[in-house]
Amino acid sequence: PFAQTEPQFLSDAVSLARQLRSLSYVELRELWGCSERLAAENARRVRTLAEDMAADTGALTAAVMAYDGIQYQHLRASVMDERQLSWLGEHLRIASGLYGLLRPFDGVVPYRLEMQAGLAVDGARNLYQYWGGRPYDALCSGRDVDTIVNLASVEYARAMLPQHARDAPPHALGTGPQVVTCLFGD
């Protein structure tokens, strides 16, 4: 599958990319908490990240193909037929520290930015404050959503789902969709 759409929060992602670019290599490595090799590779990416995001959507990677966590490995979008990909486009949303919330075929560039990273930007102390409730609002707006199946890690669910949605028992009545959280373990 190829990238077909622009991320909804692209201008916010560009702001984050510019903030990353303003950091020194030492600050970036500390923010990422990664090896020297990964830090060097990603520091090079950061220098052109904002500009790379502005590329023609068709030249970018579809979000569903860009990540390699266990959820994406088992999803196997690369072997889906057109009907399955269409369903995926309507129902799947991807939490991202850089892009906020992505649809499967939004065009993305390679980056490193975990949701729990302590990146201060635009008056927010961290990415949780920066994104606030916007990803959840986008997830639920314009569609008839009665259930969210949450495959995200705790760190990403914290950013994407309001506290009441994360903590409510499955049978609870209230505002917003029911959230079913899947736990992954060895």
Question: Language-model segments: which ranges?
Answer:
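Internal, well-folded beta-alpha domain core
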Residues: 77-186
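Near-N-terminal "mature-domain entry" segment
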Residues: 1-113
